[in-house]
């Protein structure tokens, strides 16, 4: 943000590098290598997730509450923003225990309301689109806290460039169909192989 100072941090580093690597490694490893198990966990999460009670996910992340509170209190922050559920769970615990004294905002980066958002209690929730408001409300997130601003992206993606100018800049043909392959930061895997296979199957001048 122009005129603002932003500090990025991994909350789990407050418990040491081993904890941070273990949490990140377990999550990414399950998604990439045993996705069916991740799907099973997700479905179970949907079944037990409720705004009426707290889940084991909440209590696990609550363990970092005092450390995160100490870190925040030791810096002159005006607001905390998290794009992940786990810190939102931690800060929900902190608010409950009067350990958080500045606003906290969550940014949802999924085009759905994933399990356990409804058991969090932050000041605002930035969500990808206004069409998701009914889903979040149905799950128990107050509508007045929902801000349908979209998923934050680099400003480079917002440049207004015509199709012709973009193709010319990339030295691409002007008059043939083209495919743009995009993926998230984890989970899909072997994107280069997928793109190569897709290229082999292109026909009628497709690229």
Give short role names for the model-derived ranges.
Residues 2-4, 96-101, 141, 200-206:
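Short helix-capping segments at alpha-helix termini
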Residues 4-75:
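Conserved N-terminal ligand/cofactor-binding loop architecture of enzyme catalytic domains
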Residues 11, 123-185:
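A nucleotide-sugar donor-handling region in carbohydrate enzymes
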Residues 16-18, 89, 114, 153-156, ...:
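Generic structural signal for helix capping and beta-alpha/helix-loop junctions
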Residues 43-140, 145-148:
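Active-site and donor-binding regions of nucleotide-sugar-utilizing enzymes
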Residues 61-62, 106-107, 159, 163, ...:
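A conditional alpha-helix N-cap/helix-loop micro-motif detector
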Residues 169, 174-207:
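Conserved catalytic-core segment of nucleotide-activated headgroup transferases in glycan assembly
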